[in-house]
């Protein structure tokens, strides 16, 4: 009996396609395992770069508010994901997984992480235009380390001395920031405190990332439409009368799906520890964009706090 899954099929097809491209010798030399590793690293870098672009994207969609951009992004992402699955012929594979859920308890368990997902995507679009860019980036810096802690506590994973040292540096950095500001940003806490819960729940459910994403977006789509009709009808007129906004929102949806797709493929190709380390590229980009592009304030006293966090990451 074949042990191929939809994700394995997708990964194998991608690897086979890449192998036919005229790539540099370093990409094609070595064993198949080495080539897969190189391709996984490339996809991880691409996905993190795309997420960095998406973080600054909302600043180019003024006068839409951060919440309105979030609503439009969810709808554009849903449409782009459905289009991708239809064109690739994989929609049926994901629907078959959902058809296997036959009880209310199974569906309730499946939908439990959805509010966390939606709140995280809202914060991702709201923070850059509301002065919370640096604080949100700090949450993403802490997210991988929080995953290590959750893995240790919930799954009995063992930490090496270096990993404990990294967690310690990050903890001191966060503590320093709390002392400096005499508070801690709710955006930082929300990212590092709830996003790991989302991934842990999806892991326990054993559902693929694309299937989970399809469920999350489909459930939210009617609420997004209702919001535009009854709460923010002005944004409908603004978007509908502007080819610029239509193209920008279409690009937002396609970039979002591409970012998620490359991220999922990278997670299938890379060892867990390598994939985890690659995930630090995104918060570094978010932090830089928050300061340079979005104009969020950065005080010299923050160097100590963030320096300790970066030291833990290194």
List each model region and its residues.
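Membrane-interface helix termini and inter-helical loops of multi-pass transporters
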Residues: 56-66, 95-98, 129-132, 174-175, ...
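C-terminal transmembrane-helix exit sites in multi-pass transporters
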Residues: 142-162, 284-303
């Amino acid at each position: 009996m074949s042990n191929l899954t939809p994700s394995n099929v997708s990964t194998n097809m991608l690897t086979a396609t890449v192998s036919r491209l005229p790539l540099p010798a370093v990409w094609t030399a070595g064993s198949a395992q080495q080539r897969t590793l190189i391709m996984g690293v490339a996809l991880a870098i691409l996905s993190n770069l795309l997420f960095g672009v998406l973080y600054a994207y909302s600043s180019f969609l003024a006068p839409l508010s951060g919440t309105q951009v979030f609503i439009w992004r969810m709808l554009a992402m849903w449409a782009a994901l459905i289009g991708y699955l239809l064109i690739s012929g994989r929609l049926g594979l994901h629907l078959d997984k959902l058809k296997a859920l036959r009880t209310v308890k199974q569906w309730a368990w499946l939908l439990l992480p959805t509010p966390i997902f939606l709140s995280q995507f809202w914060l991702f679009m709201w923070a850059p235009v509301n002065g919370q860019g640096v604080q949100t980036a700090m949450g993403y810096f802490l997210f991988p380390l929080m995953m290590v802690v959750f893995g240790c506590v919930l799954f009995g994973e063992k930490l090496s001395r270096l990993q404990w040292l990294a967690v310690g540096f990050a903890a001191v950095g966060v503590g320093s920031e709390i002392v400096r500001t005499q508070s801690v940003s709710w955006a930082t806490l929300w990212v590092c405190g709830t996003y790991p819960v989302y991934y842990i729940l999806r892991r326990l459910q054993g559902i693929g990332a694309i299937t989970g994403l399809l469920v999350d977006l489909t459930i939210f789509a009617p609420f997004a439409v209702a919001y535009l009709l009854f709460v923010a009808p002005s944004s409908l007129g603004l978007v509908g009368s502007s080819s610029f906004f239509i193209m920008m929102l279409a690009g937002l949806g396609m970039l979002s799906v591409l970012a998620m797709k490359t991220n999922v493929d990278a997670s299938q190709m890379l060892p867990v520890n390598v994939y985890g380390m690659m995930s630090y590229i995104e918060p570094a980009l978010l932090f830089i964009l928050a300061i340079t592009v979005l104009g969020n304030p950065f005080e010299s006293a923050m160097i100590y706090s963030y320096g300790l966090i970066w030291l833990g990451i290194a």
